[in-house]
Curated annotation (Swiss-Prot):
The keyword Manganese applies. The keyword Lyase applies. Its EC number is 4.2.1.44. Keywords: Cobalt, Lyase, Manganese. Its cofactor is glutathione; Co(2+); Mn(2+). Belongs to the IolE/MocC family. It comes from the Bacteria. This is Inosose dehydratase 1.
Length: 298
């Protein structure tokens, strides 16, 4: 289905240890995490909170298992803090990823975000940016995009539950306000369906701008409970709203077909944060790998 050597398969370490709730998977070590990724048949991963920040140490650990770094999340605060604060941290992050050989930097605006708040209802309290904040966000992303390109990288914007860029309208507004040469899009199946959006619409409309893909499924019954009981994003994760592709309600056939027929080159990263005590990360990594092999031929 996919042209040879165009797509690499990664998996996020958040299934082993959760960055937002470190108590989930606290006993899972870095070495266990990357060893199980390799055993499950993946080519690489994104960066988790247990990963060494010393690139020499990290490269050696990954090379032993034939793994690469696909990218790493970066939180921007362009709507709520001075640009300089985000830029200073971004440059360190950019240089780290450049040294690790990554080609994209995942960015997500966390100004007013409720995704990390345990007791704030997800759908009821979703932030909405003012026009001034939208302008700050777009201008700031252009600045970060230029900084990324100084080292040959691209920023990919991660639309995300509980943030100011979550819905179809918000994604469209951000894409309209930003330069395609400087700001690309991360396509995440799970966050779109969780929000009630139509993922194929976003995929088709912004296909040329999509430079990174997160493969994530959802358990609809948990999402329904989150809405009915006004739960937070973190409570949704703990209750199992997300799972690996093939284990939930999202149909991936057309997603894979559209991407295979496009010029997409880059990573597919399985990112399915859930409680590792309830969903063994190695078992679910194997499940995801088998599904992708069957559906995408990768």
């Amino acid at each position: 289905m996919f042209k040879e050597n165009t797509v690499k398969l990664g998996i996020a370490p958040i299934a082993w240890t959760n960055d937002d709730m470190p108590e989930l998977g606290a006993g899972n070590t870095f070495e266990q995490c990357i060893s199980e990724m390799a055993l499950a048949g993946f080519n690489g991963s994104e960066v988790g909170n247990k990963y060494p920040r010393n690139t020499v140490v990290l490269k050696k650990s990954l090379a032993l298992r034939n793994l690469e770094i696909a990218s790493a999340w970066f939180s921007t605060f362009l709507t709520t803090k001075p640009l300089e604060e985000t830029v200073e941290e971004f440059i360190k992050h950019r240089d780290f990823l450049h040294d690790m050989g990554a080609k994209v930097i995942v960015v997500s605006e966390q100004g007013h975000s409720i995704q990390g708040l345990m007791d704030v209802p997800l759908f009821k309290n979703k932030p909405v940016f003012t026009e001034e904040e939208w302008n700050k966000l777009a201008d700031g992303l252009h600045h970060l995009g230029k900084l990324a390109q100084e080292k040959g990288l691209h920023i990919v914007y991660h639309h995300h539950m509980g943030t100011g860029v979550q819905t179809t309208a918000e994604i469209e507004k951000l894409m309209d306000m930003t330069n395609p040469a400087l700001v690309s899009l991360l396509f995440d199946t799970g966050h779109l369906v969780f929000s009630g959006e139509e993922p194929l619409y976003i995929l088709k409309k912004y296909l040329p701008r999509i430079k990174h893909v997160h493969l994530k499924d959802i358990r609809q019954e948990v999402v329904d409970t989150v809405k009915e009981n006004e739960l937070s994003f973190l409570q949704a994760v703990k209750n199992g709203a997300f799972t690996v592709p093939g284990d939930g309600v999202i149909g991936f056939d057309e997603v894979f077909t559209i991407l295979a027929n496009s010029d997409y080159q880059g990573w597919f990263v399985v990112e399915a944060e859930q409680d590792p005590a309830l969903a063994n990360p190695f078992e679910y990594a194997l499940k995801a790998r088998k599904f992708i092999q069957e559906k995408a031929g990768l």
